[in-house]
């Protein structure tokens, strides 16, 4: 499915082209009003002007969002409490999570503590909303039979590295977000075929992620140079997302029962085939380190071929076929 639409223009004007309650998910990374260079003057507003700008676009976001929809909002510390109040008190939205994006490297300070996180607000339009927990689970370090086979809820502290200027996938944009963060939002709060809106598209991370996860996506962008960057990005070869939670390839150290080990490996291989095929090698290496070389019956190529040959089978048939992919040591 390819239904990715990028629109050039001011977000407040472009919102008018979106029908009421037609969007399933909004991911918004607006200018923080810190004077960054986005190729326009929209990051240097007076305090009150910035709040009014925020109030206006948030009202539009609320209008176009379905009753089951979710908005994720990146925001700096200076204004986040004000935008929280607008969402909760003025728009009557439901706070779901205050997410902390933790990164290990940032700007250094000599008179104060160096910043190492950004904040993300997650609000739902109503108490009935989409949340696909099984698509975003993280393997535990130690497995317990009462635990879900796919792992645990990743929590509201997310560790993803910045996209540094020296990285080959860095785009000419001052606040490019890691694809892994957006991937988690899209998987958690939308389904295949749903419509995602990014009113401040920037370098096009949300559109790129939706392109790969079979979501429709609409992006607004004011700077024509970024439009070209986004188009180039969407037309480039896909070699996997540029970041992921490093815990995803973790293998529990205490899968003592053979049947549970088999099921665990099968479940995770299915997940990697769907979302992170390029990480299968790392996962298999970790399995072998913990449970021995004989833990994997099929090679990586055989696993990939199995995926290609299974596109026309039902989910139950795929599950049955994949039961033969992984074996572990006898007790």
Annotate each predicted stretch with a short phrase.
Residues 228-331:
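PRPP-dependent phosphoribosyltransferase catalytic core
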Residues 1-229, 294-296, 305, 311, ...:
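Core catalytic lobe of class I
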